[in-house]
Amino acid sequence: MAEEKKEFWRWPEYRRTVPGKDWKGAQVITAGVDVGSVSSKTAIMVDGELYAYAIMRTGSSSAGSAEKVTNWALEGTGLTIKDIHYTVGTGYGRVNVPFAQRAITEIACHARGANFIWGPTVRTVLDMGGQDCKAIQCDSKGKVTNFLMNDKCAAGTGRGMEVFADLLNVPIEEVGPRSFEIDEEPEPVSSTCVVFAKTEAVGLLRAGWPTEKVLA
């Protein structure tokens, strides 16, 4: 029997409920649902504090993915989608979140979220999404002042990283840490196209380059 090929690009889906928090006496329960091109995420907030979250791969239906990931985040809490007072949809499929009261671009959400978590000193947010890569500039209140986006090619995007993870047989969650394991400056991959860059990476491996150097 042929051995099943491991999919190194496939990152683990997960969920978590913050211990020690109780929603039953909460005044406001809110949710943010990010339906991306590759992954769908839900974060549940109770009175302005994180209560539960989940992330899973986006399916063929944006609406179905939004409901599935939100129900998974709520699993075991006693909460249902109907108990959430206000929901915002964001990401590639933001307008298809059926239970959301509002849809906001992921660019605005990134800026506000970074400001909420790390405070007013944040000025730049980098987002490597599944189909594009964004550099976002924001002010001390988390308002977007400028942004740049690469949406023309998979090179430099999350999907591009998945391609290299599978090529190098490295689990996707190890790509970042292992790329920092070399002490020398890596040779740049000359191609800006992920297809040609993959071919170039194959050539480097055949030339005897270690996996970590190719990753870097």
Which residues does each predicted region cover?
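Flexible inter-domain linker/hinge segments
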Residues: 1-27
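Gly/Thr-rich phosphate-binding beta-strand-loop-beta motif of the actin/hexokinase/Hsp70
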Residues: 19-51, 122-142
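Short glycine-rich, Thr/Ser-proximal phosphate-binding strand/loop in the N-terminal lobe
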Residues: 32-68, 72, 151-152
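Short beta-strand-loop/turn "lid" adjacent to the catalytic site in phosphate-handling enzymes
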Residues: 52-59, 77-108, 136, 142-145
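Glycine-rich phosphate-binding loop plus the immediately following alpha-helix
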Residues: 59-62, 143-181
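Internal, active-site/partner-interface "lid" segment
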Residues: 171-204
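Adenine-nucleotide phosphate-binding core of ATP-dependent small-molecule kinases
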Residues: 199-216
